[in-house]
Regions:
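Cyclophilin-like peptidyl-prolyl cis-trans isomerases
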Residues: 5-8, 15-244
Length: 244
């Protein structure tokens, strides 16, 4: 099964010219698992740390201003991850988050963004060649269809296309938690997500590097524009970004 999946992925990537291992949305678990405390104390550690840097996003919805989100970053705990995110906020390397979109928003879960390389080529209501992304979640293979050139399949770090997981010292501490999206171990790039609920099952899989310090109400407004599939009802864009 695994060999077949890899073969399909390789063929699709070669055919479309797209990456078959683009960052996918963090996995969702059932409310039953949460209510039973299935993930309680699975990973020890703090849910926050000292803030060393503060950055911001000015967000629009359908071209209209939605508000500003400020995020405090944990530079003492994950300096490499923080340096990457900060540089992409300022655009000091010649590329970054300004003008990119939150391409996947799932109410009661998270808002994901950070693909600033492929977001411009997506055309609403129009399908092109598709690829299959196989995510290995525990012992299950989950197939997702993605537009071959669509938002959510790109991005890059300041260190190259990807960089390793720095550590998992900070746990996902509920709404406002800022964490790296990935396509598996050691595949961090530029994509990230802001949690809108408790997500303890992500501990040990995604690197937490900050939290929302101002504008959680703006995150809630963004959340209301999403859907269970992750598709947004209107374009949610980072119009500007930088340091505070």
């Amino acid at each position: 099964m695994k060999q077949s999946c890899v073969a399909i992925l390789s063929a699709c990537a070669l055919f479309t010219g797209a990456s078959a291992f683009a960052p996918a949305a963090p996995s969702v678990v059932s409310q039953t698992q949460l209510q039973m405390g299935f993930f309680d104390n699975l990973f020890g550690g703090a849910t926050s740390a000292d803030i060393t840097e503060t950055v911001y996003f000015d967000v629009t919805s359908g071209g209209e201003p939605l508000g500003r989100i400020e995020m405090g970053l944990y530079g003492d705990v994950v300096p490499k991850t923080v340096a990457n995110f900060k540089a992409l906020c300022t655009g000091e390397k010649g590329y970054g988050y300004k003008g990119s979109v939150f391409h996947r928003i799932i109410p009661g879960f998270m808002c994901q963004g950070g693909d600033f390389t492929n977001f411009k080529v997506m055309s609403a209501g129009k399908l092109s060649w598709c690829i299959i992304v196989i995510s290995i979640l525990e012992n299950y293979y989950v197939a997702e269809w993605h537009d071959a050139c669509a938002v959510g399949t790109g991005g890059k770090s300041i260190y190259g296309r990807t960089f390793p997981d720095e550590n998992f010292d900070i746990k996902h501490g509920g709404a406002g938690t800022l964490s790296m999206a990935n396509a598996g171990p050691n595949t961090n790039g530029s994509q990230f997500f802001i949690c809108t609920a408790d997500t303890p099952w992500l501990d040990g899989k995604h690197t937490v590097f900050g939290k929302v310090t101002k504008g959680l109400d703006i995150v809630r407004k963004m959340e209301s524009l999403g859907s269970q599939s992750g598709a947004t009802r209107t374009e949610v864009k980072i119009s500007t970004s930088g340091t505070v």
